[in-house]
Amino acid sequence: MSRVAKAPVVIPAGVEVKLDGQVISIKGKNGELTRTLNNAVEVKHADNTLTFAPREGFADGWAQAGTSRALLNAMVIGVTEGFTKKLQLVGVGYRAAVKGNAVSLALGFSHPVEHALPAGITAECPTQTEIVLKGADKQLIGQVAADLRAYRRPEPYKGKGVRYADEVVRTKEAKKK
């Protein structure tokens, strides 16, 4: 049995929840998020809580219920507080700038890298070597951050590249003659 699924999700004031079969919509001050739930999970909306239970006939019911509870809890946090992800650019001449709905990166290539941001994600650059991504969808924020990091991952000898703000890059020792 999933211990995660047994804990209900508390819905704070100012958040609307619509449950239509297996499709759930959560609306708050930061926008609206919609997700289709697994058929193995039964969700009940009562008072200001969402409770989860597995349906009969599904072997992975409790596991899916725990996953669904974690995803919906992230949706509630996203529409109330939002999520942020910080990236750092380490390297000589590595710079970032926000141009409209895109992030422009100078990463040592012969051309600047332009990355369009999806709807619901905003970016800002407090300095030329920092990018702060903000949005309500936790999965989408992580995917955009991973896409930006993939342009120039931190290399293991000097640590140059795009890294998460809390990432520790393990560096190797240079080859000795």
From Swiss-Prot:
Similarity section: Belongs to the universal ribosomal protein uL6 family.
PROSITE patterns listed in its UniProt record: RIBOSOMAL_L6_1 (PS00525)
Function: This protein binds to the 23S rRNA, and is important in its secondary structure. It is located near the subunit interface in the base of the L7/L12 stalk, and near the tRNA binding site of the peptidyltransferase center.
Protein name in the entry: Large ribosomal subunit protein uL6
Keyword Membrane on entry: no
SUPFAM superfamilies: Ribosomal protein L6
Record-level Gene Ontology MF annotations: rRNA binding; structural constituent of ribosome
Quaternary context: Part of the 50S ribosomal subunit.
GO biological process: cytoplasmic translation
Sequence intervals crossing the membrane: none
